[in-house]
Design a protein with these regions (language model features):
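A conserved helix-loop-strand patch within extracytoplasmic ligand-binding domains
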Residues: 14-22
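Phosphate-binding and adjacent anionic-ligand microenvironments
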Residues: 21-182, 188-212
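Short Gly/Thr/Asp-enriched flexible loops that form oxyanion-binding sites at enzyme active sites
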Residues: 1-13, 39-40
Length: 212
């Protein structure tokens, strides 16, 4: 209604309302590693567990079957249903589930308006060769573990690091000769601090992160 674009991670959090309410504590919803912490927190507030998964529809499809997840989603917009569907990303089926929710008085615009304000970057690509992108991840990983507690670092798919400002991500693209960067702060100032941290880490590896 408001003409706003809704990213796939937040749309997945909204669609979690369509999952059957029984045994929520035993059901895990998957979001890919690029997803907002707001989406994770919202899913957990509904009584589900939330799991960070690798980006890529093949990775998500594999994981949804492994843990019998009722729902998974990527920031890019791929939505996977495993409760009453086959566990793969079907845009038409996702649209039907969305329309079913709205027909039952779950309105997407109202849901989005209840979420805390997010200060999140777009997905930023830093182009470099495959050799360089994996070497860069390895080099930055060593520096990260010298600075951060291991509990604040996820290495499932690149590096996702949490700190007092929010979180940042550097990962190797699955489809391009590029690194993918994203960060989300608790305020505009925090987002800028995260940007500068990632920019300096990449600069030390001879790579440039342009202003977004």
């Amino acid at each position: 209604k408001q003409g706003r674009s809704v990213a796939g991670d937040l749309l997945t959090a909204f669609l979690a309302n369509s999952i059957a309410t029984n045994n929520k504590n035993n059901q895990t919803i998957i979001l890919d590693i690029k997803s907002s912490y707001v989406a994770y927190e919202n899913i957990m507030s509904l009584g589900f567990k939330a799991e960070i998964g690798k980006t890529g529809h093949s990775n998500i499809k594999k994981r949804i079957k492994e843990i019998k997840s009722p729902l998974a989603g990527e920031m890019s917009g791929h939505i996977f249903f495993g409760d009453t569907y086959f566990g793969y990303d079907d845009a038409l089926y996702a649209a039907i589930r969305l329309l079913t929710l709205t027909a039952n008085n779950f309105e997407l615009d109202k849901f989005i308006s209840t979420l805390p304000e997010t200060f999140v970057s777009p997905e930023i690509k830093v182009f470099c060769s495959d050799e360089i992108k994996f070497l860069t991840i390895d080099n930055i990983s060593k520096k990260v573990f010298e600075k951060y507690n291991s509990n604040d670092v996820i290495t499932l798919d690149g590096l996702r690091v949490k700190n007092n400002h929010g979180w940042w991500l550097i990962r190797a693209s699955n489809t391009e000769e590029a690194l993918v960067v994203r960060f989300e702060g608790k305020s505009e100032k925090s987002k800028k601090e995260l940007f500068l941290e990632v920019k300096n880490l990449l600069k030390n590896e001879g790579l440039t992160l342009d202003n977004y």
